[in-house]
């Protein structure tokens, strides 16, 4: 699974790795460092696999480029995931094709409500307009990709999350949701590294110092290869 987190550096007035960016926790712009993480879960274990520091202004790669690089490295190291889990930020067509076509892996991801799907050949509609009942799993054609299964989660406030998978055998709604719920383990991981490593409390301003102090703490978690 992959997701990014913001290392809050709001009290560091100058930091070469930090920039103003939106924080979901703060519900606004915060000065921070964007860290993109990839994890492997095995039962109740949460195992870090890889990470990247994303710097929008000076990075020659997007977060999606980093995501693909980490996937390729995981593939080269012998990982065989049951599912690759990610949110809508990482569910671009290029990413889905890399996972499903090149690596022959299955994915479960969020889709934004405006992603185009088709029930009838040649007719595309936003997934938000799809006739999709609660707890229904439906087979549709995702534009520029191919057949997928989709379902939706409706929370207590009525907000809707759309999920998609290329595993056309995942027809039972409860199984679909149960597999995707593993993605929340990356949120546990992000909270854990912030609380236990002090990674947000390093106020070095130079990128070279940050890389030398903060991320060896992170990489000290000893990224494994699968057994």
What positions do the PLM features span?
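Active-site-proximal, Lys/Arg-enriched surface segment
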Residues: 1-44
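Single, function-defining residue in the core of a domain
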Residues: 9-14, 44-227
């Amino acid at each position: 699974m992959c997701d990014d987190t913001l290392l809050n550096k709001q009290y560091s007035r100058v930091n070469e790795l930090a920039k103003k960016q939106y924080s979901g926790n703060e519900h606004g712009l915060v000065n921070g460092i964007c860290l993109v993480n990839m994890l492997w879960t095995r039962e109740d274990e949460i195992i870090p696999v890889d990470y990247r520091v994303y710097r929008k202004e000076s990075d020659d790669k997007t977060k999606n480029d980093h995501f693909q690089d980490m996937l390729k490295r995981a593939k080269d190291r012998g990982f065989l995931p049951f599912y690759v889990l990610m949110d809508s930020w990482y569910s671009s067509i290029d990413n889905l094709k890399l996972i499903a076509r090149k690596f022959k892996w299955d994915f479960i991801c969020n889709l934004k409500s405006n992603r185009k799907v088709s029930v009838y050949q040649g007719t595309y509609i936003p997934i938000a307009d799809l006739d999709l009942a609660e707890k229904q799993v439906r087979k549709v054609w995702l534009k520029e990709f191919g057949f997928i299964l989709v379902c939706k989660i409706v929370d207590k406030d009525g907000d809707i999350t759309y999920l998609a998978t290329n595993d056309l055998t995942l027809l039972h709604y409860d199984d679909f949701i149960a597999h995707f719920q593993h993605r929340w383990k990356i949120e546990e991981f992000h909270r854990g590294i912030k609380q236990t490593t002090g990674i947000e409390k390093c106020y070095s301003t130079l990128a070279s110092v940050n890389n030398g102090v903060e991320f060896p703490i992170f990489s000290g978690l000893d990224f494994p290869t699968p057994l």
